[in-house]
Amino acid sequence: NLKNRITKGPWHVDAIVDVDSRNRVVYFKANAREKGDTTPYYEHLYRVNLNGSGLKLITPGDYFHLVSMDKSMRYIVDNYSRVNTIPATALYDNQGNRLMTLEESDFSQLFMAGYKFPEPFSVKAADGVTDLYGVMYKPFDFDSTKVYPVINYVYPGPQQEGTFFRYIPMNPRTDRLAQAGFVVVCMGHRGGHPSRSKWYHNYGYGNLRDYPMADHKVAIEQLCTRYKFMDINRVGIHGHSGGGFMSTAAMLLYPDFFKVAVSCAGNHDNNIYNRWWGEKHHGVKEITDDMGNISFDIRIPTNQELARNLKGHLLLIHGDIDNNVHPANTIVVVDELIKAGKRFDMLIVPGNRHHFDDYNEYYYWRMVDYFSEYLRGERETGADIKDLKLGNWFQGYQ
């Protein structure tokens, strides 16, 4: 039987960290409660009595807090950062008292080498009301008097949005790509991260292909109006897995806006992707005809249905033994592109599954070459990739 509700309010409980059954206290992670946070995605540690009283913030500060609690539940190690701050670690007790700073990362050599932090931003969604939060990555030799092509790195979710709000080591799909002469942007969208709200998370239900697209297009339009160094006429898009699906869909839904895409390991047809994914995130539509007969529609719109819309430059990449997204997801798109008489490019990565292991560096340079050719007008000639050193940089980047 339900005894009582422990927490309430317009914020999100992410996970229970531990329960002190003797003192009847629960420690948990939550976000979007602290009014001083610059983004609702920042997680904090809290404690509250099981009867709902005594709610207390343990890890304050306008940061994303990664916490670890000792077995006695007396002490907490807090690793905190934003995308534009030096990561640091502090020790707290379970009452929220900061006992000491344990460590602060030394970025002196990075700064001497020219490193610059990415920049967080916020824009409005296509509804003109919902706030969206994102991160902008610039070349380290950025010149505000120049105009740069724009690349949108995407992941649709709906379990996350491919946007990091804490500091992470350089991501080849964002920071590193920007060093090739691009402004790279990532942002959330309605239907994305579950930590925003139930309404926000469910926005894409029943519309699994199209739901994030309008928000990204409108977000980029706002940024290009706000920042004159961003060229709205040279916009590319790329992503992996769900992001591969999304980047191709963007090219086909907004073919006059997105000019170039590198789409990697995309689940372009969610009717043949993992069955639970479509049923959970797209759902089953109940249809009643004029006679009162009920039928159920489980079909999900696909990218290959839109192949005839392609206008720009599309590079499709897939591992030939992908154990998450079957290569058939890309092949069906290829088939329809051929039938529609479209030019496109394709790279099959032999002997590789969903992530490309030692071929990740090759994938990175092919992506750089593709965007450089079609967004910057710079084409590498010859067969050799001069800077290539095969290796696996994938360490949890989505």
What is each residue range found by the language model?
Residues 1-22, 31-34, 48-65, 94-126:
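Multi-bladed beta-propeller domains
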Residues 9, 38, 296-300:
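A conditional alpha-helix N-cap/helix-loop micro-motif detector
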Residues 26-30, 76-79:
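Residue position within the beta-strands of beta-propeller blades
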Residues 28-40, 160:
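Short, conserved, GDST-rich strand-edge loop motifs in beta-rich repeat architectures
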Residues 36-42, 82-85:
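Short, solvent-exposed loop/turn segments at conserved positions within beta-propeller repeat blades
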Residues 41-45, 53, 87:
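Repetitive beta-architecture junctions, highlighting loop-to-beta-strand starts
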